[in-house]
Amino acid sequence: MAPSAEGASGAPTPEDLKLHQLSQKYTAEAAKRFRPEGLGQFIRLKEVGNERFRALAEDPWVDHAALNAKEPVKDGSRYKFIILGAGYGGLLYAVRLAEAGLASGPDDILMVDAAGGFGGTWWWNRYPGLHCDVESYSYMPLLEETGYIPKSKYAAGPELLEHAYRIATQWKLHDKALFRSNVKTIRWDDESRLWSLEVTEGRGPGQQSRELKLQARYVLLASGILTNPQVPKIPGLETFTGPVFHTARWNYDVTGGSPTDEALNRLEGKRVGIIGTGATAIQVVPKLAKYAKELYVFQRTPSGVWWRGQRPTDPVEWKTKIARKKGWQRERMLNLDSYLTDAAEEGQENMVADGWTEMPAFSAVIGSPRHGIVEPTPEKIAEHLGRLYKLDLPHAEQVRARTDSIVKDPKTAAKLKAWYPTWCKRPTFSDEYLQTFNLPNVHLVDTDGKGVDAANPSGLVVADKEYPLDILVLSTGYVTPSIGGGSPAVRTGVDIYGRGGKSLDDKWQTHGAATLHGVCSNGFPNLFFTPLSQSSQAANNAFTLDVGTEHIVQVIKTAEDRVDGDALVEVTSEAEEAWSFEIMKHAGWFASVTGCTPGYITSEGEALRKSEDPMEMAKRARSGNLSQGMASYMKLLQEYRADGSLKGFDISSRA
């Protein structure tokens, strides 16, 4: 559905006509990229049939000897809390539990992660050029509590990984983690009223894995949104004979350098290809271009690239303007979010003042408190889309004009322009990427939305032209967290069975999302998950994690205090249905994605497919979010917790 070409008086204005023409251009560009297989055009790296490619998913950073030297977790061990994930989300759970007085004993917490250490996405991703794309003062968790001062406005990958270890050290979590481990099943035992987990712990090459059965009173799911690298199903890809790797598992043995040394000297004299032009490639491409003899950038959909403005942290500014009072980091998160949700008040201080704060139309996918609920009628949705397109137009045109001003070759510049609304793909920021295409050794291979046609032993094929390569880099992203309707079980990659052996995934597939506040589901007592569906999201994922973990831990704390410890906490079916109905009322807002190009946000277009099945339509609506933005969601949760009643939960003593 496109915004209407008619103005308020009924006659189209010049701006209305321009917006209508733009929406038609967007629609045409999106149509080029739709593929009937949707998510099926990709496969998880660890599930690729070819053994050589499947091995690319293995952990290149793990120190097996050091981990094997630690005292092993005993089979049959029981914990108060088992947290699945040891990235920033899992660490926030552990810290919040400790600060609430819920986890002071040696067997109170166990964090389980497939990685070889703390850090989550910052453990796995160590590619050259890696930085967080959100300001580090707002993104890096617990800065106020640790007293750490980031080195620059946008922290580099090694610093982000180091910060995870800083948190683990300060809260003494090093001996409360089980790494290299995959949880296969989580099953509720009605008799013991405990969760039973089947876990496989890897021990490294030549070592037999350990099969463990663990028990927990509470299970907290902290799986991230960038955890499962995917690769496109390009015919013949497995026949390519040169080195190949995914950006999420960078191979410095091939490129030279290291995570802290971006001198990729082994690329000298090499023809390098990189597939993908998303948020990762924006950072990687300039680094590859410095050393490769020839660099070929294979593009399906260009990214909109805005200015970055990286700079070192000024100690005086930090003390006087940033960390100036208690609660400064939450305030800064809220301030950034207000600009992205079109909620900034006239004259308010712009604390972050970067490219993110110049795109209020991003509210199209995260919500805004400014406009209320959008009625799901054709007229109201068209009006809503028209307002969003109008809001986005100045910024979108500036982004495209910036491309023209930087890229010297007009044909290349035209191919690098993003013809879709700002909110359809993760916005990117760089003061190097576009400039790279002015270098004589860098070649843009635009596939006009089709993607790479095929691969052979010596390179890639696009539009019947072969591009010989020595090395191939896959910057092809991650499995969308909304796969499986956003089921926490699918997202975590674990089979979860609640009361009576009921499968959490089956519940999602049959009825759609069913939660209270997006964090727990009836039939699965003492199981909580980080908000995704039926909650709210922020461009700054650390804000989402901060709000979600705070709420979950406070709910548990209140329940434990009520029964003097050993609580059983379960949302009622009535409460989750009432919450699901509330979520469905907000679905009209997210019609904003109807004009989007296929990608991560739209599940490669699957979220845009029309359905006449009322059940399917209801399931989709239930899987949405609140449309007023993260600040409104946070306030709702705070008000909910304020009276201490925990309305909608059944709370009893487990004993």
UniProtKB/Swiss-Prot annotation:
The polycyclic ketone monooxygenase accepts bulky and complex substrates and converts them with high efficiency, making it a promising candidate for application as an industrial biocatalyst. GO terms for molecular function: nucleotide binding; oxidoreductase activity. Pfam families: Pyr_redox_2. Optimum temperature is 50 degrees Celsius. Disulfide bonds join 424-596. Its cofactor is FAD. Optimum pH is 6.5 to 9.0. Keywords: Disulfide bond, FAD, Flavoprotein, NADP, Nucleotide-binding, Oxidoreductase. Its EC number is 1.14.13.-. The keyword Lipid biosynthesis does not apply. FAD binds at residues 89, 113-114, 121, 124, 132-133, 139, 183, 492, 541. SUPFAM superfamilies: FAD/NAD(P)-binding domain. It is an enzyme of class 1 (oxidoreductase). The keyword Flavoprotein applies. InterPro entries: FAD-binding_Monooxygenases (IPR050775), FAD/NAD-bd_sf (IPR036188), FAD/NAD-binding_dom (IPR023753). NADPH binds at residues 277, 280, 301, 425, 452, 600. Signal peptide: none annotated. Belongs to the FAD-binding monooxygenase family. Polycyclic ketone monooxygenase (PockeMO) that displays excellent enantioselectivity, acts on various ketones, and is particularly active on polycyclic molecules. Breaks C-C bonds through the insertion of a single oxygen atom adjacent to a carbonyl moiety, yielding esters or lactones from ketones. PockeMO is able to convert linear ketones (including cyclohexane and to a lesser extend 4-octanone), cyclic ketones (including cyclohexanone and cyclooctanone), bicyclic ketones and polycyclic ketones (steroids). Performs oxidation of the keto functionalities at both the A and D rings of steroids. This is Polycyclic ketone monooxygenase. It comes from Thermothelomyces thermophilus (strain ATCC 42464 / BCRC 31852 / DSM 1799). The lineage of its organism: Eukaryota, Fungi, Dikarya, Ascomycota, Pezizomycotina.
